[in-house]
Swiss-Prot record:
It comes from Aeromonas salmonicida (strain A449). The gene is pdxH. Catalyzes the oxidation of either pyridoxine 5'-phosphate (PNP) or pyridoxamine 5'-phosphate (PMP) into pyridoxal 5'-phosphate (PLP). It is an enzyme of class 1 (oxidoreductase). NCBIfam families: pdxH, PRK05679.1. This is Pyridoxine/pyridoxamine 5'-phosphate oxidase. Transmembrane segments: none annotated. GO terms for molecular function: FMN binding; pyridoxamine phosphate oxidase activity. Binds 1 FMN per subunit. Keywords: Flavoprotein, FMN, Oxidoreductase, Pyridoxine biosynthesis.
């Protein structure tokens, strides 16, 4: 199918160098708040890219759970494909696709594992059914049918009905220590605005990139 004619103009306005804060997280926070105000579906959803031992890139959508000067945090099953790939290569790429606002944010960096205390604190903040689901799924492994998952979920829901769900030993989190951040704002005539932050010591170097 030819989809070459599916296009539109980007008319929401530009991004100017004079308006950029010195710290990329300040602009990220502003854009994320605007994405939330615009009622975008899952504004914290990010495409997480990793690379396997053969050099094959893999992508999946994961929810951002926390960010600060130390980095961006997400949680996952440590037996998952992405966890195995990050064990071999801790380099990572994140993309926030806020298409409705004609924006995207691209982050690169490397991961560090979260402490058990941090993981446990977040795990027990989740709804109980989500905690149980973490026990049910051996992420990225092959299963014969959905019924296998549903039966295991009901079994564990009964088991943990009157008590706390323990933290699975195979469940954890990563902090992405940020190296670069690129902000993209759609512009008229395909002359989009792109600004690229690169970490330099305790600060950031900012460059404008051609669209």
């Amino acid at each position: 199918m030819d989809v070459a004619d599916l296009r539109r103009e980007y008319t929401r306005g530009g991004l100017h160098r004079a308006d950029l804060p010195a710290d990329p997280l300040a602009l990220f926070e502003k854009w994320l708040a605007q994405a939330c105000e615009a009622k975008l579906t899952d504004p914290t959803a990010m495409v997480v890219a990793t690379v396997d031992a053969e050099g094959q890139p893999w992508q999946r959508t994961v929810l951002l759970k926390h960010y600060d000067a130390q980095g961006m945090v997400f949680y996952t099953n440590m037996g998952s494909r992405k966890a195995h790939q990050l064990e071999g290569n801790p380099r990572i790429s994140l993309l926030f696709p806020w298409h409705t606002l004609d924006r995207q944010v691209h982050v690169t960096g490397r991961v560090e594992k979260m402490s058990t205390f941090e993981v446990m604190k977040y795990f027990h903040s989740r709804p109980k059914d989500s905690q149980i689901a973490a026990w049910v799924s051996k992420q990225s492994t092959r299963i014969s049918a959905r019924g296998v998952l549903e039966a295991k979920f009901l079994e564990l829901k009964q088991k943990f009905a009157n008590g706390e769900v323990p933290l699975p030993s195979f469940w954890g989190g990563y902090r992405v220590v940020i190296d670069t951040v690129e902000f993209w704002q759609g512009g008229e005539h395909r002359l989009h605005d792109r600004f690229y932050y690169t970490r330099e010591g305790d600060g950031w170097h900012i460059e404008r990139l051609a669209p």
